[in-house]
Structures are given as C-alpha cells and as structure tokens.
C-alpha cells in the first residue's frame, strides 16, 4: 500500500480521526440484531485497510487521489487536516546581506521548513563592489549602494511572502577597521533605509551590525557541515570538517578537536559550545583580525616601507609624493604601482614597487612568515601565531577529516588551474612557480586557459600565494602533506557564513512579519 502520510505522527493522528468517523457511521445504523440477515453481495463498509490512498502531495493539506476525496470525504478531510496542522507553510525565505571589506553580497535562501532540519531548496546570489566601508563618512550613500542587491531580492521573493521574509545585514572586518563612529552611522543609515523603503522585516537587535569574528567563523562551519550532511542528519554523530576562511581583512579558523581522555580544551574566548539538531559540539574558533589577504599585503609592504625609513631611502612624513622601492614579493620585470601602504602609526605612503632582477620567492616567504609574529609570547600553549592559543591540528584533528579552505584561498588558486583538492605542498609549489616570473609562466601555464592573463593583469599573485602558504603552514601548523579542499559551492549551494547565519532566522524569535499597508 502506498504510504499515506509524511511520517508516523500524521498516521497516528489521522487514524484516530478515521476510527472515530467509522464508529459514528456504525452507531447510526442502530444496535446489532441477533437474527440480522446479511444479503449476499451486499455492500460491506470498508475498513481503513481496504482503502488505497496515494501519497500526500508536496503541498500540505492536498490529497492527490481525487476518487478518495469524492467517495470518502471525511477520510480525505482527516488526511488534509493532519498535514495542514503539522506544517501550514512549506516554503520560507531569508535574505542575508554580507557587507564585506571589498564588496557586498546578497544571499536569498528558500527553505522547505516541513523537514528537520529545514531543507535548503534554492539560493539566489548576487554581489557588487565596493564595500560599505569605502563610503567612509557618506552613510546615506553606503545604504543606497545596497539597492541593486535588494532589487534582486524583490524580484526573487514572491509578493505574498515578502512581509514575512526577514532581512539581515552583517558587516565583517572591513567595517570594523573603519572605527566605531563611522561604522555606526553607516549601519544606522542602512537599517533606516531597509525599514522605510522595503517590505521585508528587518531582524531586531543585531540584525544590522558588525558581526563578531567568532560568529563569522562558526556560521561558516555550520554552513559547510550542513551542506556536507555532517550535521543535522538523523543517525549517529558524524566527523566534521574544519573550516579556514580568508577574507580581505581577517581570517577565521573553526574545527572540532578531539582530545585524549585525560585532556580537554582550554577555556577561553576561542571555545564555542554549539547545539545543532540533537547534537552538541565543542568547537575551537578564532578570528585573526588584520590577517586577511589585503591586510596581509599591507603588513608585508609595511615592513618594506619601515626598512626604507630606517635606511633613509624615504624620509619620515614625506608622504605627499610617490616613492619607488624594490619588493621580493614581485616576480622579475613585474611592477605594482600606486600602492597605498598604511603603517601602524597610521601614516600612509604611496609606493611604486619594482620587481627584482632575479626571482626572490624565498625572501618573500621570509617576509610573509615574519608578519605572523610567530615568536610572540604564548601564555596558553600551544599557540598558532601572534600569541593565540590553538589546539594542535596534528594531535587533535584526524587526518581522515576534511579541511576546507574558502574565499580568497579559492579565488587566488582556481584561476591558475589548481584543482578543488590539493596538498599544502602543491600550493607551496604553485607560489614558488608564480614568483619566478614570466619565462616560467609561459612554460607552466600556457595550457591553462586564462591563467596567463590573470598573472599578467594582477601583480599580487606571488605575494598572495606566499602569504597563504605561510598562514596555513607556519601560522596554523598544517603539515605540507595534508590534503586541502576548496570551492565556492557544496551541493551547488554557495559556501560561506551566510547560510549558517540564516538558519536561525527561520524561527521568528527576533523579527516580526511586517504589517502590509493598504
């Protein structure tokens, strides 16, 4: 017999109603007679087991078998009543805007909320540049810059669903670096614009805010492991993947360490207890502000400028003109012009960096290692870099567990032909080859479509790849032979923190449907 209900709870409820209906029908015939005669071939009332009902349709409260509806209306009503009461609304939408350091991105998610956990059915994604932080004091301009993304949301979310589709704007490292006063004005203008000019309810409290680094990393971990099916699924607890995210202003690490019986994670801000579905997870997470890709570039270039100031090649305070300096993080014959370098003193110098006569990849790696401040005092061993405690990945994270590296890790490797899975040593080889320059490029990358154009149009590849190797190997202590996975999507869904941050918004705990004006 085809299954009647979506799950056994529907079956129990509906079966009770069916039996009540049959009992009422039977009682209306009158008390049974001892000498009651049954006429041959007479129509005998059917029991529920005799009735064949097709599965309930995807729409709650809809019965596919029209014959059953006609002949047994009470039974059909019972089925529809049970499904409707349990799940009155299948599809819900959530709008999440990621206001990053280099640009803003909108993710519009469509969920089936009749499953546990909710099933992600579809995602609409779009992005634009520049980021909110580039507007500096123009807070209204910053708010209006999101209009193209919100137009995408207006076109995607059905009209009837808009008033109950929450929207949140989460800014990351770029806006943090702008300072409290400027960032607060921008966020206030964004909230005001959303509330006045759009039909979507804005999430209360921290719905429009600068996201804490711990949240950013943990939400990315949730997204990744949710899409991989590692969390939220029925059955035994599964091993989870580690997540390393590299943005423009910061980098995050999140993983679930396992300790020997007599050990446990050291308490501190790095420890994050998470409940997802029926399982509890104790995660290590940390957001290294100032160690995103673009901040890493600036740190390396700052070392070169500071050295030039010490050597008298640049006079302190002489920042009204463009200076020329050689950089080991450029391949031979490659220049990086008009680079703005901001020192710790907040002084900014404009530099034209010139590539050396000979490849200097080793010297570049020395610089990218140096900025990690690996020798900083470690008050709670073991530490990764800059004095930050981190459980050893070698000791507490099995080699069979996946490591995923996202965002700029993907953006700087994929255009050069790297696969979606490679060892850290292979990434190290790529950095070494890129830093050698044009002659080597022509022999190595000629068969990879578009890669030579990428290298010739962007002078930062040598520095960026060297920094990534330093960050993963010297910083996080990942062995060179360890396999890494990367990508922009899992199961055709965008990777990042946004999905993980959107899942809690399916419960209207901190937002209310907007009242539609007449």
Curated annotation (Swiss-Prot):
CDD domains: ASKHA_NBD_GDA1. This is Guanosine-diphosphatase. Keywords: Glycoprotein, Golgi apparatus, Hydrolase, Membrane, Signal-anchor, Transmembrane, Transmembrane helix. Residues 1-9 are cytoplasmic. The lineage of its organism: Eukaryota, Fungi, Dikarya, Ascomycota, Saccharomycotina. InterPro entries: GDA1_CD39_NTPase. It is a single-pass type II membrane protein. Present with 8680 molecules/cell in log phase SD medium. It comes from the Eukaryota. Pathway: Protein modification; protein glycosylation. Belongs to the GDA1/CD39 NTPase family. GO terms for cellular component: Golgi apparatus; Golgi membrane; membrane. Glycans are attached at residues 41, 280, 335. Homodimer. The active site is at residue 216. Residues 25-518 are lumenal. It catalyses: GDP + H2O = GMP + phosphate + H(+). One of its GO terms (biological process) is protein glycosylation. Signal peptide: none annotated. Its EC number is 3.6.1.42. After transfer of sugars to endogenous macromolecular acceptors, the enzyme converts nucleoside diphosphates to nucleoside monophosphates which in turn exit the Golgi lumen in a coupled antiporter reaction, allowing entry of additional nucleotide sugar from the cytosol. It is found in: Golgi apparatus membrane. The keyword Hydrolase applies. The chain crosses the membrane at residues 10-24. GO terms for molecular function: GDP phosphatase activity; ribonucleoside triphosphate phosphatase activity; UDP phosphatase activity.
């Amino acid at each position: 017999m085809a299954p009647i209900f979506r799950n056994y709870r529907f079956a129990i409820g509906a079966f009770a109603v069916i039996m009540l209906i049959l009992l009422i029908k039977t009682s209306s015939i009158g008390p049974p007679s001892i000498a009651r005669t049954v006429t041959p071939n007479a129509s005998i009332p059917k029991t529920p087991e005799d009735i064949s009902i097709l599965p309930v349709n995807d729409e709650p409260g809809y019965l596919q078998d029209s014959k059953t509806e006609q002949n047994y209306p009470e039974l059909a009503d019972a089925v529809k009543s049970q499904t409707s009461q349990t799940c009155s609304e299948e599809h819900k939408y959530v709008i999440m805007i990621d206001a990053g350091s280099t640009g803003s991105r909108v993710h519009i998610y469509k969920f089936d909320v009749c499953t546990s956990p909710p099933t992600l059915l579809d995602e609409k994604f779009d992005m634009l540049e520049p980021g909110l932080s580039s507007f500096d004091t123009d807070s209204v301009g910053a708010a209006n810059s999101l209009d193209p993304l919100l137009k995408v949301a207006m076109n995607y979310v059905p009209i009837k669903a808009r008033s109950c589709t929450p929207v949140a704007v989460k800014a990351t490292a770029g806006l943090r670096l702008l300072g409290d006063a400027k960032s607060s004005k921008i966020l206030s203008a964004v909230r005001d614009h959303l509330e006045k000019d759009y039909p979507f309810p804005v999430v209360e409290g921290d719905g429009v805010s600068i996201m804490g680094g711990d949240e950013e990393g943990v939400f990315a971990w949730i997204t990744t492991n949710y899409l991989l099916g590692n969390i939220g699924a029925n059955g035994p607890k599964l091993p989870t993947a580690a997540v390393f995210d590299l943005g423009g202003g910061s980098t995050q690490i999140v993983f679930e360490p396992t300790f020997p019986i007599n050990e446990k994670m050291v308490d501190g801000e790095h420890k994050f207890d998470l409940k997802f579905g029926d399982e509890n997870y104790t995660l290590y997470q940390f957001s290294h502000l100032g160690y995103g890709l673009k901040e890493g570039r600036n740190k390396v270039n700052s070392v070169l400028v500071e050295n030039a100031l010490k050597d008298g090649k640049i006079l302190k305070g002489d920042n009204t003109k463009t200076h020329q300096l050689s950089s080991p993080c450029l391949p031979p014959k490659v220049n990086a012009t008009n680079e703005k370098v901001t020192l710790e003193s907040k002084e900014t110098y404009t530099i034209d960096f010139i590539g050396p006569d000979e490849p200097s990849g080793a010297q570049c790696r020395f610089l990218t290692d140096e900025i990690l401040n690996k020798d900083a005092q470690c008050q709670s061993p073991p530490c990764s870099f800059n004095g930050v405690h981190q459980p050893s990945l070698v000791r507490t994270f099995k080699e069979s567990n996946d490591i995923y590296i996202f965002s700029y890790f993907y953006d700087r490797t994929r255009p050069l032909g790297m696969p979606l899975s490679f060892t850290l040593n292979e990434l190290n080889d790529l950095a070494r080859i890129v830093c050698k320059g044009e002659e080597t490029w022509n022999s190595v990358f000629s068969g990879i479509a578009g890669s030579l154009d990428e290298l010739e149009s962007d002078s930062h590849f040598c520095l960026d790849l060297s920094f990534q190797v330093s960050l993963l190997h010297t910083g996080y202590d990942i062995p060179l032979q360890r396999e890494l996975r990367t990508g922009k999507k899992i199961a055709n869904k965008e990777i990042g923190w946004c999905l993980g941050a959107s899942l809690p918004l399916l419960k209207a705990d901190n937002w209310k449907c907007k009242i539609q004006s007449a």
